[in-house]
Amino acid sequence: MSVKNIRNFSIIAHIDHGKSTLADRIISECGAISDRQMSSQVMDTMDIEKERGITIKAQSVRLNYKFNNENFVLNLIDTPGHVDFSYEVSRSLASCEGALLVVDASQGVEAQTIANVYIALENNLEIIPVINKIDLPNADVEKVKHEIEHIIGIDCKDAICVSAKTGVGIKELIETIITKIPAPKTDDEAPTKALIYDSWFDNYLGALALVRIYEGSIAKNDEVLVMSTDKKHIVQDLFYPHPLSPIKTQSLQSGEVGVVVLGLKTVGDVQVGDTITLVKNKAKEAIGGFEKAKAFVFAGLYPIETDKFEDLRDALDKLKLNDSSITYEPETSLALGFGFRVGFLGLLHMEVIKERLEREFNLDLIATAPTVTYEIYQTDGEFIKIQNPSELPPVNKIDHIKEPYVKATIITPSEFLGNLITLLNRKRGVQVKMDYITPERVLLEYDVPLNEIVMDFYDKLKSLTKGYASFDYEPIEFRVGDLVKLDIKVAGENVDALSIIVPNEKAQSKGRELVSAMKEIVPRQLFEVAIQASIGNKIIARETVKSMGKNVTAKCYGGDITRKRKLLEKQKEGKKRMKAIGKVNLPQEAFLSVLKID
């Protein structure tokens, strides 16, 4: 196949704007799968992707299409749409020459679309605006065209209107891809460079790398080098990606997309964004932009049954084979026993991983409240980073603390603007920009501490705006904050898993909210249980769970009052002893109550 007949493109869209359905339509229009074989969402392979309607891993498919009596190869590179996976998006887009910008005709441009379009523009991709779901009764094509032009600045007079559901406009869209998106620029004589834009683990073949060949070529049995690790491997097999079963090939030429089998044991050896080159004709430098995926959000994961600790370790090891962005290390908690402090790309990533651990490995887990990384500058000049509030040094040893900030982009119907600004101010947000896209919709940009977002910001945003606002964030920098550690004591015992780091001015109110929430959850005992919130040694709030009364005088019929008094005194003594040594078992809701406070 001549390089001039290859088109590499991806689809950019917000969740629920019909990206996976459109991909399926393009695949069936090109005849890669018969209608009978078509399962909805061919590109989404994980059950959890289909259930949540999201794309987590980038998938690819090679399609053949005849146009003007010439055969063309279309490589459709599917990208995740969610903010947590934006690094995977950037690598997928770097493998393309063009992108379809898909916008729902009834909903308009959303926040996550903007972030991904900017990545595409940075990579100088040819962008084709596609307005989807034109079959819906409330579709407003002209309004959506205006929004795309106003927010993103792309001319929409030639936008393609399609309905992925009914198939309207799909043929015209494929022909536009061929005529508008340029062929790959290649140099067959240059040393081989291949960009890994996805990798996953196969039980039979080991770690597989999905690559786009930029320069040169790779053939079966070649000795290749992974540039960031400097490790050498032999190419055992090469495939073209196909939705049903991959097609074997002897070589991959520049401009092509394919799967490379190197017989590796873990995906950590072929990380997304890395470069593969040949040992005999080594490239001088790697393709730019490679970063190791960084964890932003951390949470403790503990098995409810303490003897399942090793099972949890095995499960995390297996997930790590397929997702090199997870980080984890063992930790112990006085309240919860042995577990792991796990790092995630973001909140959705955390939910997906916890759900996969429970579903695929049959584990019952307690997750502590999510936290972020803090930079602690100590009075003795030492500098440390912590992810667990219980690691915070004593107050007298801290000079100052820095916390991570993110740039939050929100698009909301203007009727909810007042409520949203109140929420953002309460979350310590700083307004950077406010722009009316149309009289009914507003674009907001705020700098917000990441810690305020990981708790429950997304849920509150959705409930305040009846689900109409969309939200995206990207990390910017660490800034100094006036922060303190809030500890919770139950029956005099410090519950380390409930410690949180909060702004000083909110500590009092958060402490009060937390102890009153805990009071509702902690089960009543035969003795009184004090729940206290403290900063250092200072108690700032307290609630008491009253004891259950046992009627010790029930067996005294009538009789002497002194007899009853004696029994009551004895009970009082017993309760005193019990209180001193009593242990309170906290339910999972207690650990989640931290998330519910505002």
Curated annotation (Swiss-Prot):
- GO terms for cellular component: plasma membrane
Catalytic class of the enzyme:
hydrolase
CDD domains in the cross-refs: EF4_III, LepA, lepA_C
Cite the SMART domains for this sequence: EFG_C
Recorded catalytic activity of this chain's protein: GTP + H2O = GDP + phosphate + H(+)
- Alphabetically ordered keywords of this record: Cell inner membrane, Cell membrane, GTP-binding, Hydrolase, Membrane, Nucleotide-binding, Protein biosynthesis
A Pfam family reported for this protein in Swiss-Prot or TrEMBL: LepA_C
Annotated localization = Cell inner membrane
**EC number per UniProt:** 3.6.5.n1
Q: Does the keyword Protein transport apply?
A: no
Q: Where is the signal peptide?
A: none
Disulfide bonds, which pairs? none
Q: Which family does it belong to?
A: Belongs to the TRAFAC class translation factor GTPase superfamily. Classic translation factor GTPase family. LepA subfamily.
What name does the UniProt record give this protein?
Answer: Elongation factor 4
